[in-house]
């Protein structure tokens, strides 16, 4: 019996990883997925080229209307760390196709901002501020300023 999965090519996997700076595309994670290994001739990679719509029938977010070429295309892929890849496939109601597509778009936009700036700090700051609202408040009993972080759902244009 042949392979019934429409897997990405190596070139597609590389393109997915490189277009987001080899960082997880989940805006709540953004973990670097590749780095040095103790063996100087190797790298450590924890990144995964995940399918937005499943590569095979019965998989998460499978779309029967897609052709095999569409299922294994760059457009149907997203670069994630291993944890986030497992997460999106475990709860498909919480992580629908449209959300994953918005993550991919935001991750690519963030990566290009990092490339265009002299330091990655402004791009990362813009990314963080678009995801978080930070409000200072004073704790009267200890007389110190504390920080409270509220998570706000991102609105992707």
What positions do the PLM features span?
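Histidine-centered nuclease catalytic patch
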Residues: 2-5, 31-77, 88-105
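Charge-rich interaction segments
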Residues: 110-157
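Short cysteine-rich clusters marking metal-coordination/redox-active sites
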Residues: 24-29, 81
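A boundary/linker detector
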Residues: 1-21, 33-34
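Short metal-coordination and nucleic-acid-contact micro-motifs, chiefly zinc-binding Cys/His arrays
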Residues: 17-25, 73-77
């Amino acid at each position: 019996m042949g392979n019934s999965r429409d897997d990405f090519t190596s070139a597609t996997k590389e393109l997915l990883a490189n277009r987001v700076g080899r960082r997880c595309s989940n805006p709540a994670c953004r973990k670097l997925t590749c780095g040095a290994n103790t063996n100087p001739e190797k790298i450590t990679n924890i990144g995964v080229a995940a399918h937005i719509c499943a590569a095979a029938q019965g998989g998460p977010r499978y779309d029967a209307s897609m052709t095999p070429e569409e299922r294994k295309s760059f457009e149907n892929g997203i670069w994630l760390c291993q944890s986030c890849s497992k997460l999106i496939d475990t709860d498909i109601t919480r992580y629908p196709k449209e959300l994953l597509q918005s993550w991919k778009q935001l991750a690519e936009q963030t990566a290009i901002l990092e490339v265009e700036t002299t330091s990655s700090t402004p791009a990362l700051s813009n990314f963080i501020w678009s995801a978080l609202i930070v409000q200072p408040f004073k704790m009267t009993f200890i007389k110190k300023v504390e920080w409270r972080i509220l998570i706000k759902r991102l609105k992707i244009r």
